[in-house]
Amino acid sequence: MKYSDLRDFIAQLESRELLKRIDYPVSPHLEMTVVSDKVLRSGGPALLFTNTPNYDMPVLTNLFGTVERVALGMGEESIVALREIGKLLAALKEPDPPKGFKDAFSKLPLLKQALNMAPKYVSGAECQTHVWEKDEVDLTLLPIQTCWPGDVAPLITWGLVTTRGPHQSRENMGIYRQQLLSKNKLIMRWLSHRGGALDYQAWQQEYPKERFPVAVTLGADPATILAAVTPVPDTLSEYAFAGLLRGQRTRLTRCIGNDLHVPASAEIVLEGYLEPGNEAPEGPYGDHTGYYNEVQSFPVFTVERITHRDKPIYHSTYTGRPPDEPAILGVALNEVFIPLLQKQFPEIVDFYLPPEGCSYRLAVVTIKKQYPGHAKRIMMAVWSFLRQFMYTKFVIVCDDDVDARNWQDVIWAMTTRMDPSRDTVMVENTPIDYLDFASPVSGLGSKMGMDATSKWPGETQREWGKPITMDEDVLNRVNGYWSLLGLK
C-alpha cells in the first residue's frame, strides 16, 4: 500500500475497516491503555480517539497492532512480502559483485532506485503551520498517555528523535521514550549503545559546555517510523529507505531553531536541546517486559519550540507484557531480519524471535549443519552481526528438521540432543538492556547459547540416535483407505 503521510495512511486504513474512530470520551490517563490492550489482544483495528477529555487533539493508538498493518506501513500487503524487503536490505548492505557485463546492468535498477530516494528538502512545511515559542511552549497541552498505575508521570512513547554528532553529515533517527517533567522539559531515556546517545557522548567530548540540539517528531508517517527501527545499511539513510518503502521521496524541512531536519508532514515537532550535565531520575515505568523498571538518571530535554500542523494528531502507544505493539512489530521485523542473516550465513534455514521473549531476548535458529561446532559459530553470529541482537540473552540452535516456531519441536530437540555441560555456551560481561533487572549489573550481563543440534563425530563418542519415521509407502497405503475405516 502506497501513501503520502500519516493522515493518508489513516484514511486508507479506515477505508479497509482497519481503523476505528472512538467518539466516546476516553481519558489518556490509564483508560486508553485498557481499551488499546483489549483491542490489540483480539487482533482489532487501529484506534483514533476523537474525544479526549481536557484536550483538543485526537490520539492515535495501535497503529502497528497487527502484523498486517506493519506490512502495510512498509508498503506491502502481507507479512510474506516483508522477506523481499529483507532481501533488498541485504543486497544494499553487501551487494554481490556482478558476474559479468549483463549482470552489472541488471543490478543498476536497484542502485538507481535507492539513489533516487534521497530526501527532498522543502520550506513552508505543514509541520510548521503553527509555532509555539517561549511562554507558549506547554507540553501539558498534549494528550500524553499515562499507561500504568505505577507510572511516575505521563510518557511520550512514539517520539522519533533526530540527532547529529559533531562533524557528521548524516542525521540519526531513534525512538526513545520521554518522561514529562514540566511544561517545557522531558527526560530523554536512551541506552548508551544507541545512536542518539553516541551522538550526545561525542558532542560532550567535542563541546563540553555547549548545548546539544535535538528534534522530536510526534506523528511521522509509518515508513519513517519503521525505518528508524530497521537495520538500514550505513550507506543508506533511514529517510531514503523510508522513501523506498513509501514509493516516493521523503520530504524534509529544517527546524526553525537548529540545523536538524524533520519530516515535513509530521503532526507535531519538538525542538530543543540537552544541557551537558543536566540529568534527572527517570521512572519507574511499566515496560515491555511486563514489569516496572528501576529509576535511573538520563539527560533532560529542554523544549524551546513546538510546531504542528492544523488540527494535529497525537500518536501514542503503551508497552507491557507481550503481546503489545512493540511485540507485534517485532514479529513483522523478524521476517526482514531473516534474509539479512541468510545473506551472510546461507546455512540458516529459519530465525525466530518469540514475542513472549520480549521480542529480542531469546532467538531460535535452525540450520543445515555442516561440521562439528557449527552451532556455536551461529550463536556468535547472531550476537555480533546485527546491532538489533546485542541484547539477545538466549540463542537456541537446532537442525533444519525442527520447526523454529513450534515450541514442542524446539523443546523436543533441546531435551534429546543437548547435554547441559557440553552444549551450553556462557558468555559473561556482555551488553544487556538496562531494563533487564535480572542482570547483576545495570547494562552488563551474560548470554547463553544452547546447541540443540544432532552431534557429529568429534562432538560425541557415542552412537547418535536416529529419529523415528514411518515408511512412506505404508503411510500412503493407509491414507488411501482411511475414509473406509469410519474414523474422523
Curated annotation (Swiss-Prot):
The protein's required cofactor(s) are namely: prenylated FMN; Mn(2+)
In what way does this protein cross or attach to the membrane?
Peripheral membrane protein
Name the domain of life this protein comes from. Bacteria
What protein name applies here? 3-octaprenyl-4-hydroxybenzoate carboxy-lyase
Q: What does this protein do?
A: Catalyzes the decarboxylation of 3-octaprenyl-4-hydroxy benzoate to 2-octaprenylphenol, an intermediate step in ubiquinone biosynthesis.
Family per similarity comment? Belongs to the UbiD family.
Tell me one Pfam family matched here. Answer: UbiD_N
Claim: Nuclease is one of the keywords in the record: no
> Which NCBIfam families does this chain map to?
PRK10922.1, UbiD family decarboxylase
Q: Which UniProt keywords apply?
A: Cell membrane, Decarboxylase, Flavoprotein, FMN, Lyase, Manganese, Membrane, Metal-binding, Ubiquinone biosynthesis
Record text on cofactor binding: Binds 1 prenylated FMN per subunit.
Catalyses which reaction(s)? a 4-hydroxy-3-(all-trans-polyprenyl)benzoate + H(+) = a 2-(all-trans-polyprenyl)phenol + CO2
Gene3D superfamilies per record: Single helix bin, UbiD C-terminal domain-like
Its main subcellular localisation, reduced to a broad class, is membrane
Annotated Gene Ontology cellular components are:
cytosol; plasma membrane
Q: Which residues of this protein are catalytic?
A: 287 (proton donor)
Its subcellular locations are: Cell membrane
- Which terms in the Gene Ontology molecular function aspect does this entry carry? 3-octaprenyl-4-hydroxybenzoate carboxy-lyase activity; metal ion binding
Q: Which Enzyme Commission numbers does its entry carry?
A: 4.1.1.98
Residue positions binding Mn(2+): 172, 238
The protein's assembly and partners = Homohexamer.
Q: Which GO terms describe its biological process?
A: ubiquinone biosynthetic process
Q: Which residues bind prenylated FMN?
A: 175-177, 189-191, 194-195
